[in-house]
Amino acid sequence: MKTEKQKLGAVGENLVATHYVRRGYGIVERNVRYPFGELDLIVEDSDGTTVFVEVKTRRGTGFGAAESVTGRKLTRMRRAATTWLQGRHYREIRFDVVTVVIDPTTGGYVLDHFEGVDDGAR
C-alpha cells in the first residue's frame, strides 16, 4: 500500500507528464530506478532531445520544492541517466526540474518548469 507521500508524488508526476504531453513531448519512461538513483520521468521533444525530469511535489507553501533538488540529487540523476543511455541512440540530452505545489484547501496547483538545470535553468 502506498504512503501519503508516495500518493502525492504520483499525483505530481501525473500532472507533470500531462504538462509535457501538452507541449508536444512524448513520454519515454516513468519511474526508472537504479540502486544509486532514480529518474522520475524521461520524455523526448519533437527535435529528438531526451529530457530527464525530476519532479518535486509539495502541499502548501512550506520549504520550496525546487530548493530540495540539491547538487547531490543532480549527481545521482546524471549517473542514472548515463546508465539508462547506455546502448541507446540519442541526440541531445537535458535535465529539467518541475515543481508542483498543491493547495491542500482547494486542490488547485502551481507548476514551475525549470529547463536545463545543469546549464542554469531557463
Swiss-Prot record:
Any Pfam family matching the protein: UPF0102
One Gene Ontology term of the molecular function aspect: nucleic acid binding
Entry-linked InterPro entries: Restrct_endonuc-II-like, tRNA_endonuc-like_dom_sf, UPF0102_YraN-like
Similarity comment: Belongs to the UPF0102 family.
PANTHER family: UPF0102 PROTEIN YRAN
Protein name according to UniProt: UPF0102 protein CE1920
Organism expressing this protein natively: Corynebacterium efficiens (strain DSM 44549 / YS-314 / AJ 12310 / JCM 11189 / NBRC 100395)
Top-level taxonomy: Bacteria, Bacillati, Actinomycetota, Actinomycetes, Mycobacteriales
